[in-house]
């Protein structure tokens, strides 16, 4: 087992990474404040791991709250289901809410914990690669709004993140690839040697090699923990973690939540960010193509939806958390391994990026 730490003063917390951690109560019980525990999961994950976690928490008053699975249910109505369960079971301010699932469950359970009786204890047990390397670390919680993704939420840190890497053995191939999009992101924005490592090990990662997965998760979490410790509320450097997300969120919103997985949209969105960085002269076309090839090898889409127009993108991108005083800030690459957030770019470069023929670009790479 490896343990990392998110350094936030009195609110610092550990990230435990390893095999079989779901069966080790000593990793959880020090972070549970009372006798009441609510496990929030979904209809896919609960049949696989809920009973196991309940046994690990023997002696506690465990309330299971099982939600429908999917991004389409990351909304106010589903959030109310969590509140209904907590109130009906008379859970008090010393309850602990545990998120057992992927990013959707973690975001909603965390937001519920932040709101319930003005804040109760919260634990993250992420079961997908995407949630293990990204959404479970850093305290971002929330729900989607019909007009924009993750537009309603709060920063609310967990007391511990428990990453049992064996949970990936039941993860569908498409979900695994979606998680790799966020892993690749870390190499692009802050760790070029990690990007090289990923190029060498992407096949092993897709083959669920436990040693390779552990390395990828550790390096991703270490990168995110460092950034969150420096900028918890995304007022500066933390925004660079959103490489590809402005374009990607526009894709998710336009297509309908859940049609494209988050990681799939991030991959296509990151290709657009690479293209724009190249058009600005910040990275070479060879570096752009290097990123595209890695996303392809990870089994991810690298072409945005064909029916999305420039106006579609601009409409959705205007409703983005990085918009300040009406100016759209974008995360781009100054070079491989170095990201910046900026609103200082020619409008025509953004327009050219939005209308670029990505399918022709990919076909050229194949040739």
Curated annotation (Swiss-Prot):
Q: Which GO terms describe its biological process?
A: amino acid biosynthetic process; aromatic amino acid family biosynthetic process; chorismate biosynthetic process
Q: Name one GO molecular function term.
A: metal ion binding
- Gene that specifies this protein: aroB
Q: What is its EC number?
A: 4.2.3.4
Q: Which cofactor does it need?
A: Co(2+); Zn(2+); NAD(+)
The name of this protein is 3-dehydroquinate synthase
The record's catalysed reaction(s) read:
7-phospho-2-dehydro-3-deoxy-D-arabino-heptonate = 3-dehydroquinate + phosphate
Role, per record: Catalyzes the conversion of 3-deoxy-D-arabino-heptulosonate 7-phosphate (DAHP) to dehydroquinate (DHQ).
What NCBIfam families would the database entry show?
aroB (TIGR01357)
User: Which residues bind NAD(+) per the record?
Assistant: 69-74, 103-107, 127-128, 140, 149
Q: Tell me where in or outside the cell this protein is found.
A: Cytoplasm
Is rRNA processing one of the keywords UniProt gives this record? no
Q: Name one Pfam family in it.
A: DHQ_synthase
Question: CDD domains attached here?
Answer: DHQS
Q: Which UniProt keywords apply?
A: Amino-acid biosynthesis, Aromatic amino acid biosynthesis, Cobalt, Cytoplasm, Lyase, Metal-binding, NAD, Nucleotide-binding, Zinc
The signal sequence is none
PANTHER family documented for this protein: 3-DEHYDROQUINATE SYNTHASE, 3-DEHYDROQUINATE SYNTHASE, CHLOROPLASTIC
* InterPro entries in the record: Dehydroquinate_synthase, DHQ_synth_AroB, DHQ_synth_fam, DHQS/DOIS_N, DHQS_C
Question: Main subcellular localization, coarse class?
Answer: cytoplasm
Pathway(s) served:
Metabolic intermediate biosynthesis; chorismate biosynthesis; chorismate from D-erythrose 4-phosphate and phosphoenolpyruvate: step 2/7
Q: Which family does it belong to?
A: Belongs to the sugar phosphate cyclases superfamily. Dehydroquinate synthase family.
Source lineage: Bacteria, Pseudomonadati, Pseudomonadota, Gammaproteobacteria, Pseudomonadales
What the record notes about the co-factor is:
Binds 1 divalent metal cation per subunit. Can use either Co(2+) or Zn(2+).
Query: At which positions is Zn(2+) bound?
Result: 182, 245, 262
């Amino acid at each position: 087992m490896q343990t990392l730490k998110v350094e936030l003063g009195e609110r610092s917390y550990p990230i435990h990474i390893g095999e079989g951690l779901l069966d080790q109560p000593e990793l959880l019980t020090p972070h549970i404040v009372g006798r009441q525990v609510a496990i929030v999961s979904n209809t896919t994950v609960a049949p696989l791991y809920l009973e196991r976690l309940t046994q690990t928490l023997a002696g506690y008053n465990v309330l299971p709250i099982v939600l429908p699975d999917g991004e389409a249910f990351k909304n106010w109505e589903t959030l109310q289901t969590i509140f209904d369960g907590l109130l009906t079971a008379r859970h008090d301010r010393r309850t602990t809410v545990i998120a057992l699932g992927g990013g959707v469950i973690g975001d909603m359970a965390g937001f519920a914990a932040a709101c319930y009786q003005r804040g109760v204890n919260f634990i993250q047990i992420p079961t997908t690669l995407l949630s293990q390397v990204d959404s479970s670390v850093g305290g971002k919680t929330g729900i989607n709004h019909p007009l924009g993704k993750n537009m309603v939420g709060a920063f609310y840190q967990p007391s511990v993140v428990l990453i049992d890497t064996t949970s990936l053995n039941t993860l569908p191939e498409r979900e695994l690839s979606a998680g790799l999009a966020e892993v690749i992101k870390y190499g692009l924005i802050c760790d070029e040697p990690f990007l090289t490592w990923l190029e060498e090990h992407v096949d092993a990662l897709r083959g669920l090699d436990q040693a390779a997965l552990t390395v990828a998760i550790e390096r991703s979490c270490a990168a995110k923990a460092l950034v969150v410790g420096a900028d918890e509320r995304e007022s500066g450097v933390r925004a660079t973690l959103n490489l590809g997300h402005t374009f990607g969120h526009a894709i998710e919103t336009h297509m309908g939540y859940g049609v494209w997985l988050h990681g799939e949209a991030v991959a296509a969105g990151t290709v657009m960010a690479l293209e724009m960085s190249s058009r600005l002269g910040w990275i070479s076309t060879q570096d752009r193509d290097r990123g595209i090839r890695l996303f392809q090898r990870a089994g991810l889409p690298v072409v945005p939806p064909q029916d999305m127009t420039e106006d579609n993108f601009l409409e959705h991108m205007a409703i983005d958390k990085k918009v300040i005083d009406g100016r759209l800030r974008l995360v781009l690459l100054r070079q491989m391994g170095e990201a910046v957030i900026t609103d200082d770019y020619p409008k025509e470069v953004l327009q050219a990026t939005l209308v670029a023929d990505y399918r022709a670009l990919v076909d050229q790479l194949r040739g």
